[in-house]
Structure formats: structure tokens, C-alpha cells
């Protein structure tokens, strides 16, 4: 069974992330969205909420599972029986970092391959950081995130106002 692990902070999950998950769900038997705690990134949403948002966005995909984690990614992949890391590349600028990460993961988990997918071009410019910035300034984010995510962002920024 091919099990792919798609790790990230997903703060929040975007339509770009969703696009990669949908495509991965057609390529692999089982897709695990691995939502990293990432405390050093100081996420806008707590881990539990990011996991719940990702579950809501992907609930129509029966072979997709969403799990939060705070351990080393290589260890988590082994625990989950994953044999592939999925990473998205939006632009050439993403490649250098992802290449280093893939090489480090290969050292830590030699049985797990890294696979890079580019998003559909309509999502290639979307990032969680940009979505948060637009939402914080009251902009329309409906083209970039699922409605449940847009609602969560609106609610979060109301509380901060």
C-alpha cells in the first residue's frame, strides 16, 4: 500500500493545498495530511483547529486522513507507515529549500522518498502567509480558501480587532 505524507503547518489550509491533496488522493492509496505543531512559527490557529479545518476541507476524499504531530517528521512518517513525502513547489524559489529538506529527510528516513508536485496554475501564487495578510486587512479571500477557512479567518481577526 502506498501511503503518502503531506506535511505542513497549514495555517491555514488553502485551495492550493487542497489541489495537491486531491491530486495525491488519485495517485496514492492513502494520503496523510500531517499538520505540524510548528510552535516556532507562532501559528495564527492552534494545532487542533488547523487539523479540524483540514479535515473539513478534505472530508469528501475517503482515502485522506488528517493528523496533527509535533515530533520529528522522519519519525512521524515511520510511525504512520508512509513511504513518500509529498511537497508542493509553487515557484523555483521554493526548490532550494525543498531540495535541502528532501536530502535531510533522506538521511533520517532513507526508505521514504520525496515527491514534488506543482500546483495547478490557478493556485500557484497562493500561500498561507498571503491569505492571512489579506484576511487581516479585510480583503476578500474567498478565491483562495474553502468557505469554512474563510469563516475561521474572519472570526479570528474579529477577535483581534
Swiss-Prot record:
Highest taxon of source: Bacteria
Catalytic activity of the protein: (R)-4'-phosphopantetheine + ATP + H(+) = 3'-dephospho-CoA + diphosphate
UniProt KW keywords: ATP-binding, Coenzyme A biosynthesis, Cytoplasm, Magnesium, Nucleotide-binding, Nucleotidyltransferase, Transferase
Keyword Transferase applies: yes
EC number: 2.7.7.3
Pathway: Cofactor biosynthesis; coenzyme A biosynthesis; CoA from (R)-pantothenate: step 4/5
Disulphide bond pairs: none
GO cellular component terms listed in the entry, alphabetical order: cytoplasm
Location of the protein in the cell: Cytoplasm
GO annotation terms (biological process): coenzyme A biosynthetic process
Annotated binding of ATP, by residue: 9-10, 17, 88-90, 98, 123-129
Signal peptide annotation: none
Principal localisation: cytoplasm
Top-level class of the enzyme under EC nomenclature: transferase
Xref: SUPFAM superfamilies: Nucleotidylyl transferase
Similarity field: Belongs to the bacterial CoaD family.
PANTHER family tied to this protein: PHOSPHOPANTETHEINE ADENYLYLTRANSFERASE
Function: Reversibly transfers an adenylyl group from ATP to 4'-phosphopantetheine, yielding dephospho-CoA (dPCoA) and pyrophosphate.
Subunit composition and interactions: Homohexamer.
Annotated protein name in UniProt: Phosphopantetheine adenylyltransferase
Record lineage: Bacteria, Pseudomonadati, Pseudomonadota, Gammaproteobacteria, Pseudomonadales
Amino acid at each position: 500500500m502506498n501511503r503518502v505524507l503531506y506535511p505542513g503547518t497549514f495555517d491555514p489550509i488553502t485551495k492550493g493545498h487542497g489541489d495537491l491533496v486531491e491530486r495525491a488522493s488519485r495517485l496514492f492509496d492513502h494520503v496523510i495530511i500531517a499538520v505540524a505543531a510548528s510552535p516556532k512559527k507562532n501559528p495564527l490557529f492552534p494545532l487542533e483547529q488547523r487539523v479540524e479545518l483540514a479535515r473539513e476541507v478534505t472530508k469528501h476524499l475517503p482515502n485522506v486522513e488528517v493528523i496533527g504531530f509535533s515530533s520529528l517528521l522522519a519519525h512521524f512518517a515511520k510511525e504512520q507507515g508512509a513511504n513518500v513525502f509529498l511537497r508542493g513547489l509553487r515557484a523555483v524559489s521554493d526548490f532550494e529549500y525543498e531540495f535541502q529538506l528532501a536530502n535531510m529527510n533522506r538521511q533520517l528516513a532513507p526508505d521514504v522518498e520525496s515527491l514534488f508536485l506543482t500546483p495547478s496554475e490557478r493556485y500557484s501564487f497562493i500561500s498561507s502567509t498571503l491569505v492571512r495578510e489579506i484576511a487581516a486587512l479585510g480583503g476578500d479571500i474567498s478565491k483562495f480558501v474553502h468557505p469554512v477557512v474563510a469563516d475561521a479567518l474572519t472570526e479570528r481577526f474579529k477577535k483581534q480587532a
